[in-house]
């Protein structure tokens, strides 16, 4: 994951000091891209230990169309708790938009089912897209989508995906986002009888929070290790039937975890 460390260095050296919604302050650049060949290994950061349970359960939660933290809490995942209301609700965030986008005529559009249909029937389409950025519902969301828009692409029997992330917390959020979308590509590829290709990450406001600087320098002092391998143990009937125990990460040998505060 040298690309990830190189991004950290770039922001430290070239970033602009900026104020932000949380009041924490950041060092920021605008516009950056990284490409990960998923044939080379699973892109999980090794210079600190990442919490795999949270990454996998969060993605399964999105895929289920869920927007309440109860499922996450039942599985010892607390990454969304700070934004939930007293009932655990987050409003129409990712899961709602991915699985039941509300159309003007009252229809509920399942973007992910549409993607699967397109990949099977028209894999050369340039419209195989999922958007979480629903302008009409942003004010009802506990947190506006950071990873807002992604597109699939098929070439030579391989499935690739590009994500546009409008706002990126490099230290805490980005390792999760890369691993989550890489996992999604593997799952969709399995369901569509494709091999995996590239995951392309594109960032808008790409930043390090001022209270993550010590942790960033510690991480940069560590040498990256070999990427692990993702094993999917079974093929469920649909994309929406995967379970946590279906996934195994082989050969993950990270440096110790590094704690840092979340900007809310």
From Swiss-Prot:
Pfam families: Thymidylat_synt
Main location, first listed in the record: cytoplasm
GO molecular function: thymidylate synthase activity
Binding-site positions, dUMP: 21, 126-127, 166-169, 177, 207-209
Domain of life, per lineage: Bacteria
Membrane-spanning residues: none
Ligand binding ((6R)-5,10-methylene-5,6,7,8-tetrahydrofolate): 51, 169, 263
GO cellular component, one term: cytosol
Gene Ontology biological process terms, A to Z: dTMP biosynthetic process; dTTP biosynthetic process; methylation
Catalytic activity as recorded in UniProt: dUMP + (6R)-5,10-methylene-5,6,7,8-tetrahydrofolate = 7,8-dihydrofolate + dTMP
EC number: 2.1.1.45
PANTHER family, per database record: THYMIDYLATE SYNTHASE, THYMIDYLATE SYNTHASE 1
Described purpose of this protein according to its UniProt entry: Catalyzes the reductive methylation of 2'-deoxyuridine-5'-monophosphate (dUMP) to 2'-deoxythymidine-5'-monophosphate (dTMP) while utilizing 5,10-methylenetetrahydrofolate (mTHF) as the methyl donor and reductant in the reaction, yielding dihydrofolate (DHF) as a by-product. This enzymatic reaction provides an intracellular de novo source of dTMP, an essential precursor for DNA biosynthesis.
Subunit text: Homodimer.
Protein's name in the database: Thymidylate synthase
Species of the source: Pectobacterium atrosepticum (strain SCRI 1043 / ATCC BAA-672) (Erwinia carotovora subsp. atroseptica)
Record gene name: thyA
């Amino acid at each position: 994951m040298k690309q990830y460390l190189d991004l950290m260095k770039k922001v430290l050296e070239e970033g602009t000091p900026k104020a932000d919604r949380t009041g924490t302050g950041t060092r920021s650049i605008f516009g950056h891209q990284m490409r990960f060949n998923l044939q080379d290994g699973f892109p999980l950061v090794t210079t600190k230990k990442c919490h795999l349970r949270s990454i996998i359960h969060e993605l399964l939660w999105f895929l289920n169309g869920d927007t309440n933290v109860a499922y996450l809490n039942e599985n010892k995942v607390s990454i969304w708790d700070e934004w939930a209301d007293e009932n655990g609700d987050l409003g129409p965030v990712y899961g709602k938009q991915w699985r039941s986008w509300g159309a003007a005529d009252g229809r509920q559009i399942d973007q992910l089912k549409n993607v699967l249909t397109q990949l099977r029937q028209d894999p050369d389409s340039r419209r195989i897209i999922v958007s979480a950025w629903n302008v009409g519902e942003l004010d009802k969301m506990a947190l506006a989508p950071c990873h807002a828009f992604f597109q699939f692409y098929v070439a030579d029997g391989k499935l690739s995906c590009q994500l546009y992330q409008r706002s990126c917390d490099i230290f805490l959020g980005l390792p999760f986002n890369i691993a989550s979308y890489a996992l999604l590509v593997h799952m969709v590829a399995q369901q569509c009888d494709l091999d995996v290709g590239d995951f392309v990450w594109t960032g808008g406001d790409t930043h390090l929070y001022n209270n993550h600087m010590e942790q960033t320098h510690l991480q940069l002092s560590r040498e990256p290790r070999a990427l692990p391998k993702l094993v999917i143990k079974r093929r469920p009937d649909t994309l929406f039937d995967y379970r946590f125990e279906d996934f195994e990460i082989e050969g993950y040998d990270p440096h110790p975890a590094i704690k840092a505060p979340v900007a809310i």
